[in-house]
Regions:
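Extended, alpha-helix-rich binding/interface surfaces that flank or overlap catalytic cores
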Residues: 2-19, 36, 53-69, 73-182
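Short, charged N-terminal beta->alpha structural module
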Residues: 19-51
Length: 182
């Protein structure tokens, strides 16, 4: 249905068209917003093929918004380098960090170092600044299908109760029966 998000068999929840702060949704109220400028990339089509209903919206920052908390900026290698060269990269990352509780950058494709003639050291410096100085995680993605898979994983995580990821215990800390289950 129009204006709703569907993730697998999860109940549908209306999409929000603004990024104003709101109460944290329950695990059953997963919302995904896609900036209308992102639709030509093919990621929205990939999400639709996975059962997610998306509707275009205009996000002031970022390309995807999950549950009003996770803001995702998607950049191809060429986009990343182009943003470095025109001076907009760090402004975009700073705005993403200020706007969302959990900002993420998805770096898509394998052309980061070949898209343009830019010193690899400069690219690595920008990557280090984004993660080290701004604290924004960078998730690598090979293509639009993998980007959709990453967004699906983020959607699934947001369905769960908020909290840190649960790490599996080290093998030596488990009984033989527990090791078989893991």
């Amino acid at each position: 249905a129009r204006g709703q998000t569907r993730l697998g068999d999860a109940p549908r929840a209306p999409l929000q068209s603004d990024t104003t702060a709101e109460a944290t949704p329950t695990a059953e109220e997963v919302r995904l917003q896609v900036d209308h400028r992102e639709f030509p990339s093919g990621v929205a089509r990939e999400l639709a093929q996975r059962g997610v209903t998306v509707a275009p919206t205009q996000l002031p920052v970022g390309d995807y918004l999950i549950d009003g908390r996770v803001g995702v900026e998607r950049k191809t290698g060429a986009d990343f380098v182009g943003s470095m060269l025109d001076g907009s990269l760090f402004r975009q990352v700073k705005a993403l960090k200020q706007q969302f509780r959990r900002p993420l950058l998805i770096l898509e494709g394998d052309d980061l170092y070949t898209a343009r003639r830019v010193e690899p050291k400069a690219i690595r410096g920008a990557l280090a600044a984004i993660t080290g100085d701004f604290g924004v995680p960078i998730l690598p993605s090979a293509n639009t299908a993998e980007t959709a898979d990453l967004l699906m994983a983020l959607l699934e995580r947001s369905r769960r109760e908020p909290g840190p990821a649960q790490l599996r215990p080290a093998a030596g800390e488990l009984s033989p029966e527990e090791q078989q289950r893991h």
